[in-house]
Amino acid sequence: MTSTVAHGAGSAGPADDAEPMSARTYQVRTYGCQMNVHDSERMAGLLEAAGYRRAAEGTDADVVVFNTCAVRENADNKLYGNLSHLAPRKRTSPDMQIAVGGCLAQKDRDALLRKAPWVDVVFGTHNIGSLPALLDRARHNRVAQVEIAEALQQFPSSLPSARESAYAAWVSISVGCNNTCTFCIVPSLRGKEIDRSPADILAEVQSLVDTGVVEITLLGQNVNAYGVSFADPALPRNRGAFAELLRACGDIDGLERVRFTSPHPAEFTDDVIEAMAQTPNVCPALHMPLQSGSDRVLRAMRRSYRAERYLGIIERVRAAMPHAAITTDLIVGFPGETEQDFAATLDVVRQARFSAAFTFQYSKRPGTPAAELDGQLPKAVVQERYERLVELQEQISLEGNRAIVGQRVELLVATGEGRKDTLTARMSGRARDGRLVHFRAGDGPVRPGDIVTVEVTDAAPHHLIADGGILAHRRTRAGDAHADGQTVRGIGLGMPGIGRPVVPVAAEATSCGSAGGCGSADGAGSSAGDPQ
């Protein structure tokens, strides 16, 4: 669907009145899940290929692109609040352009312009590649452009990319989702699952490694389903395709770490566990959303598994990889949740001993079956349960981290992970299991992207401390690239990291696939992340 809407006085002027395209700068603001981060890198790549350049930090961009999330009312309010903040600048700088894409744009469509008529471009989740042309058309014609495709036009991974990191990269293996969780709006916004071919994925991974990337995260709404809906009709369905893909990644020289997100417990199979355990560069980390420990609530959520099956998967994972870090997503206050249901969730959390849990308070979202269910709970009840769950998980996380004190861990040095690093003279990195470690680098030239070995000296619920200095340091091509200025700012390494602080306020987003999409829960995360 394509439509145009005439702007008022705040619209962009004709091309002759505007500064040359080569001088125009851009900024992409991302809300939501890791799939949106992946897509934002593509938006940035498209703009740079079209002659735009990234705006310097602290400066006003000529083009501001919002890549949105549609999972909660909070996400809506945040977007429209930020758009309102730009309205005065739009009035005084008519050549400045605003574009809104992502899931909220796919959902609201023309309604977005009624709420924010100063927006220049609205585009959806299926036609990211149209962004430069839509901006150009809106700028030349002084008419807002709304283009929402109903089906995927091109895999985002095939588009140009301006990646945020020299050492870690997202690699999408599929788009869309075939599940029907009652709290999730993703299938209606991103469509049914479509899988990329293994050859395309492995070619992208190889090209990334050739540029110095040492860690990749495979992205999908439900990575376990990979292989059932290949875009290429010549490829047969293959239920074992994801395990085969993990093993194939293990054959790529120079690729040191492989992560993935997110699996669905209903389709988690033992061949994936075997591939994880037997492929050295696949990290001993698993983020597997639970959502609730109550079988009755899981049934109402249409999650297609029960607590016993979930705990059985964890048991088999730990049997194969005893030191694996397992994290999860939890929704508190789903419609009809009783105190008995909540107690069942607490019980499963105690048994599972998660390294971290990304916990969110439910809020109903129009367009999801759960929004129509009876038994919507009072906010006070949900908040009280949420606080109890976070307290329990904090205790479990701290106990798990304290058990690592005295151990040596290998870190991929990161940038932008520790807010207090400058004050404490520490740097930060991620262990192979995803834990965040703050360490003292000493006087050596340690760069983001390098590999260091340290000994853990202290622990907190969301991070580890290594103040004993560096025991080993390996310089990498990724570190060289970072030192050469080939990265702008850091991104998280793989799936929600173990080690972000408790923030008892509404989180950026929730999701039906922690990296792959967005669901319909609301609230704060005991470790900021997105639920599946």
Curated annotation (Swiss-Prot):
The protein's role, per its UniProt record: Catalyzes the methylthiolation of N6-(dimethylallyl)adenosine (i(6)A), leading to the formation of 2-methylthio-N6-(dimethylallyl)adenosine (ms(2)i(6)A) at position 37 in tRNAs that read codons beginning with uridine.
Positions bound to [4Fe-4S] cluster 2: C177, C181, C184
Highest taxon, organism lineage: Bacteria
Disordered: region residues: 1-21, 510-532
Annotated residues for binding of [4Fe-4S] cluster 1: C33, C69, C103
Gene name in the database record: miaB2
Catalytic activity: N(6)-dimethylallyladenosine(37) in tRNA + (sulfur carrier)-SH + AH2 + 2 S-adenosyl-L-methionine = 2-methylsulfanyl-N(6)-dimethylallyladenosine(37) in tRNA + (sulfur carrier)-H + 5'-deoxyadenosine + L-methionine + A + S-adenosyl-L-homocysteine + 2 H(+)
Assembly with partners or alone: Monomer.
Keywords assigned: 4Fe-4S, Cytoplasm, Iron, Iron-sulfur, Metal-binding, S-adenosyl-L-methionine, Transferase, tRNA processing
Domain TRAM: 402-470
Family (UniProt): Belongs to the methylthiotransferase family. MiaB subfamily.
SMART domains in alphabetical order: Elp3
Gene Ontology molecular function: 4 iron, 4 sulfur cluster binding; metal ion binding; N6-isopentenyladenosine methylthiotransferase activity
All residue ranges annotated as the MTTase N-terminal domain in the record: 24-140
NCBIfam families reported for this sequence: miaB-methiolase (TIGR01574), MiaB/RimO family radical SAM methylthiotransferase (TIGR00089)
Name of the molecule in the record: tRNA-2-methylthio-N(6)-dimethylallyladenosine synthase 2
Pfam families assigned to the protein according to its UniProt record, in alphabetical order: Radical_SAM, UPF0004
Alphabetical list of SUPFAM superfamilies matching this protein: Radical SAM enzymes (SSF102114)
